Regions:
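C-terminal catalytic/substrate-binding lobe primarily of soluble NAD(P)-dependent oxidoreductases
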Residues: 2-10, 164-403
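N-terminal Rossmann NAD(P)H-binding glycine-rich loop of SDR-like oxidoreductase domains
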Residues: 13-29
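Conserved Rossmann-fold cofactor-binding substructure of NAD(P)-dependent oxidoreductases
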Residues: 70-83
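Beta-loop-alpha module in the N-terminal Rossmann-like domain of NAD(P)-dependent dehydrogenases
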Residues: 90-104
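Rossmann-fold NAD(P)-binding glycine/threonine-rich loop
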Residues: 116-141
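Adenosine-phosphate binding glycine-rich loop
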Residues: 132-180, 343, 348
């Protein structure tokens, strides 16, 4: 008697927002994992993917669809598109509002991954609170949310610290992206200008107090700045330390909610760029997408590096995890997008394993599901441990690259 074995088909993958800077960084790495899924469908309202000379188009073996997604107005059209290509996994690298996509996916068997929470009116962190409080509403499939760098990878670091040292008294996410044009001067940003403008000059500055409690500032993040010397000085020597923007961010919200711990994010770009943005905001009363140019490190070569760290404070110690990437080490993308791509691919690999029950997940909840291991295998992460004594820090451990 012959035993028939059912061959499990590889899921077809669609990436929306496929012509963006982050998608470009993901597609540079995706050929390494091309045999993990079936058909690859790249979708964007722009049609410039085929002209990208840095991508291995032959190995990617993709179908490109030039289309603008309009949700919820054209939900049926969107679902029809997913069915037409037999999509099993949807990776969202767009700036489309998140909730309409999640609502649409309730009516189709598709797994979903995104890098951030997008909302036209309101605060992105409020979506995180709502989704954690109402997980059952979107339990029709696996949903991995906020799996980029900030948020995403950094939350895997926090969970690593919690597993090793326990829940801290507070968590501080810090980032200093010193990128600038290699020649001349331009006011640039290395990732989504639209998202940056929203969180720095439209949403009010905020810090998480633990649980779903939030301390809101009266002003926006571009006008709420904090000296980053106290955070970076223990782990990095700089001639001058920047004053970063205190930005409300999804990684703070999910960590605060899941572990009931205060959390905040302080973000700095090149000091000259920040001063220019502050000046523009004071003059205009707002920032616009036209105030910045995308520094892609391709058409516009860049110098500088993106330094991202998280500090976990305990009564007797401070623990840091940090990654730095230099633009000079990247080909076809910039350091920032290369960092984000690690989170996207970690989330995708976790999804493709297929052993997650249907529900909403944030990256700190994927600790034992392979996510952390992929991150540590894909980027150099340093660990610093400092003892606290008389208000000062004394280093007790430094691991140049953890595994």
């Amino acid at each position: 008697m012959k035993i028939q074995r059912k061959i499990k088909r590889k899921p077809n993958l669609m990436i929306i927002g496929a012509a963006g800077a982050v998608a470009n960084a993901v597609l540079l790495k995706l050929p390494e994992y091309r045999n993990s899924f079936g058909r690859l469908v790249l979708l964007d309202k722009k049609g410039n993917i085929r002209k990208n000379k840095h991508l291995d188009h032959k190995k990617l073996r993709y179908v490109f669809v030039r289309k603008k997604i309009n949700l919820p107005a054209k939900e049926k059209e969107f679902l029809s598109l997913l069915k037409r290509y037999g999509i099993g996994v949807l990776v969202d690298l767009s700036t489309i509002d998140t909730i309409p996509i999640l609502e649409a996916l309730r009516r189709i068997d598709v797994k979903y991954l995104n890098t951030s929470m997008n909302i036209a009116d309101g605060a992105s962190y409020s979506l995180v609170f709502d989704l954690i409080n109402n997980r059952d509403k979107f339990s029709e499939g696996v949903r991995i949310l906020c799996s980029g760098m900030n948020p995403g990878v950094v939350n895997a670091w926090v969970r690593l610290g919690i597993e090793t040292y326990g829940v801290p008294d507070r968590v501080t996410f810090i980032e200093y992206d010193s990128s600038r044009p290699a020649s001349g001067w331009k006011t640039i940003l290395t990732w989504s200008i639209e998202q940056f403008v929203n969180e720095s000059s439209i949403e009010r500055s905020a810090v998480m107090l633990g649980g779903d409690r939030v301390r809101l500032s009266k002003d926006v993040a571009v006008m709420c700045r904090e000296d980053m010397a106290k955070y970076f000085r223990p782990i990095m020597k700089m001639a001058d330390y920047p004053k970063g923007f205190v930005v409300p961010h999804e990684e703070c919200a999910s960590i605060a909610m899941l572990f009931n711990v205060p959390a905040k994010f302080v973000y700095a770009i090149h000091p000259k760029t920040m001063e220019r943005l502050v000046s523009l905001y004071k003059k205009q009363g707002e920032l616009s997408n036209h105030d910045l140019l995308l520094g892609d490190n391709v058409k516009m070569p860049l110098v500088g590096r993106d330094n991202i760290a998280v500090r976990l404070d305990y009564k007797d110690k401070a623990v840091y995890y940090m990654n730095s990437m230099d633009n000079s080490d990247q080909k076809g993308t910039n350091a920032t997008c290369a960092q984000v791509a690690v989170g996207v691919l970690a989330g995708l690999r976790t999804l493709l394993k297929g052993d997650l029950p249907s529900r909403v997940y944030f990256t700190s909840e994927l600790f034992n599901k392979g996510y952390k291991d992929f991150v540590l295998d894909s980027m150099a992460v340093q660990k610093f441990v400092f003892k606290k004594k008389n208000g000062k820090l004394k280093m007790s451990e430094h691991v140049p690259e953890i595994h």
